[in-house]
Each structure stands twice: as structure tokens, then as C-alpha cells.
Amino acid sequence: MNSFAFLLVCIQACLVQSVFSQCTSRAAVAADRGIIGGYGLGAPYGLGCGYGLEAPYGWAGYADYGYGLDAYGGIGEGNVAVAGELPVAGTTAVAGQVPIMGAVKFGGDVCAAGSVSIAGKCDCGCGEVYGYGLGAPYLY
């Protein structure tokens, strides 16, 4: 009788654990109000986005180039390769100076509906001369 009672208690413990783990699993707590969701680190009001550190109003927000915590430095060198299908719908606007040294090449079919226009001027200078980079206003 004692072993039967012990077995019954073990079965009940497994059932209770199974029932409560469905409602309060690690994923449910983290996704709703834990570290990665809700008001946690990756939330709209946490460190990841919204009003947090990486937010538009946070440290990496709307700052001039070279002033924000995560602002683009303006200096870069290397190859960029994109493979696969790139369906693009809508409007893409790039404002400001975009210095490009090298060549831009499309291989294969590029289907576009609508109009594509590039306006502005292209300078071959890059870096602090044009006000980009870390501490740009102090490097003149």
C-alpha cells in the first residue's frame, strides 16, 4: 500500500507540473512580460526599441551622422553581395550625401514597375572631410 501511495503522489506531481507548465512556461513569461517582450529588454519601452536605448528617442536615435551612439561612421570598404529574390514594393527614399567609390552592378533580371530616379551629386571623398565619422566637427 505504501508503494501505491508513493506512485500516486509521483503521478499527481507530474500532472500538476504538466498543467502549470503549459500556462507559465519559460517562453510564455519571456515573450509576454519578461526579458524579450512586453516591457522587457527587447520591448517597445525597453532597451531594444521604442523609447529604450536603441530607440528613435534613445541613445541610438535620430542624431546627425557621427553624433548618435549607433550612428553611421561614414567610412566603409568591402563588398556587398545579395543573392535571392528581392521583391520591393513601395517607395524608398535616400536623403543626404552617399559617397560611393567603385562600381554598382546588377547581374540577372531586375524587374521594376514604376519609375526609378537618382538625383543629386556624387562625391568621391569619404570620411571626415564631409562631416562624417567619429568626432567629425573636431577633425577639421
Curated annotation (Swiss-Prot):
Give the GO biological process terms. chorion-containing eggshell formation
Keyword Repeat recorded: yes
Which keywords fit this entry according to its UniProt record?
Repeat, Signal
Indicate the secretion signal residues.
1-21
Q: Which domain of life is it from?
A: Eukaryota
**InterPro entries, per this entry?**
Chorion (IPR002635)
User: Which molecular-function annotations from GO does this UniProt entry contain?
Assistant: structural constituent of egg chorion
Q: What's in the GO CC field?
A: egg chorion
Please give the family membership noted in the entry: Belongs to the chorion protein family.
Q: What does the function comment of this entry state? A: This protein is one of many from the eggshell of the gypsy moth.
What this protein is called in its record is Chorion class A protein Ld2/Ld41
